[in-house]
From Swiss-Prot:
Name of the protein this chain belongs to: GTPase Era
Binding site for GTP: 15-22, 62-66, 124-127
Role according to the record: An essential GTPase that binds both GDP and GTP, with rapid nucleotide exchange. Plays a role in 16S rRNA processing and 30S ribosomal subunit biogenesis and possibly also in cell cycle regulation and energy metabolism.
Pfam family, one: KH_2
Gene name tied to this protein: era
This protein's GO CC annotations: cytosol; plasma membrane
Family: Belongs to the TRAFAC class TrmE-Era-EngA-EngB-Septin-like GTPase superfamily. Era GTPase family.
Region (G5) location: 154-156
Subcellular location: Cytoplasm; Cell membrane
Region of interest called G1, as start-end residue ranges on this chain: 15-22
Source organism per UniProt: Buchnera aphidicola subsp. Acyrthosiphon pisum (strain Tuc7)
Keyword rRNA-binding: yes
Gene Ontology terms: biological process: ribosomal small subunit assembly
Sequence segments annotated as region (G2): 41-45
């Protein structure tokens, strides 16, 4: 019996904040493993997604959106770590927002070019481009920048060109043993998953009222056999003012955040959940 060759590699997803990296990752994996919102820098840590199809295993790393200093357009290294993640990369997916090429895209491209790793550029949100004729001149403009392995216009939200994208990625995976079992879709811990579910609701309910640096700490996570899940979490904010914003008038806002978070946790883990949230300030 002939043994099938196996292929496996790491694919790093990079780009400015809010260009659709997490949406793309979720659609490639086929499950929501990274929270999504219109707020910039929703993703605060590397999110790993795993897609195994037959003898191919792609390990995707969704990096936080690259942040720039407003004064000098320099990358803020302490908030972005794709320099480290590219060390293990087989392929880099560089996502840009429609045909909006900025100095920040240029800076990111110059950095990832230094890695000598193959780069696939994705022009995302093409569903928002009414006149598609302008795409071709823009693609020609990009081709002059570097010899990309492919320039692919897509709509991550509407999953256009997803099969083509997956096939391109597979063609660059090296022959390797699979690192994770076939059933794995992420390396995120249960603690991390729960904290992200809560943080997503905070972002949705609070919008721009609070900075994206808000932190959710899981204080306890206990499962009573297969009957129920008991979770206590602390929402850390900067000061008393922010604390009152999160809690809301008569506690209405935090009640809604808690209720929807609990429902989403139950859907994720298929178990009845008891969730207690505390809001604390660091002062």
């Amino acid at each position: 019996m002939k043994i099938k060759k196996k292929y496996c590699g790491h694919v790093i997803i990079v780009g400015k904040a809010n260009v659709g990296k997490s949406t793309l990752l979720n659609n490639i994996i086929g499950k929501k493993i990274s929270i999504v919102s219109r707020k910039k820098n929703t993703t605060q840590s590397n999110i790993t997604g795993i897609k195994t199809e037959d003898n191919y295993q792609s390990i995707y790393i969704d990096t936080p959106g690259v942040v720039f200093d407003k004064n000098n357009n320099q990358m803020k290294h302490h908030k972005n770590n794709f320099y480290q993640t590219t060390q293990i990369a087989t392929l880099i997916i560089f996502i840009i927002d429609r045909i909006d090429w900025t100095i920040h895209d240029e800076i990111i491209l110059n950095e990832i070019k230094k890695t000598k790793i193959p780069i696939l550029i994705i022009i995302n949100k093409i569903d928002k481009i009414s006149n598609k004729i302008i795409l071709l001149p823009f693609i020609n403009f990009l081709k002059k920048k570097i010899d990309f392995i492919e320039i692919l216009p897509i709509s991550a939200k509407k999953i256009s060109n997803l099969i083509l994208l997956k096939n391109i990625i597979k063609s660059y995976l090296p022959e390797n043993c699979h690192i994770y079992p076939e059933c794995y879709v992420t390396t995120n811990s249960d603690f991390f998953t729960v904290s992200e579910i809560i943080r997503e609701q905070l972002i949705l309910f609070l919008g721009d009222e609070l900075p994206s640096i808000i932190k959710v700490e899981i204080e306890s996570f206990k499962k009573k056999e297969k009957i129920a899940l008991y979770i206590k979490a602390i929402i850390w904010v900067k000061n008393v003012r922010q604390k009152s914003i999160v809690i809301g008038h008569n506690g209405e806002k935090i009640k809604k955040i808690s209720m929807i978070s609990r429902n989403n946790i139950e859907k994720k883990f298929y178990i009845k959940t008891h969730l207690v949230l505390w809001v604390k300030d660091k002062n």
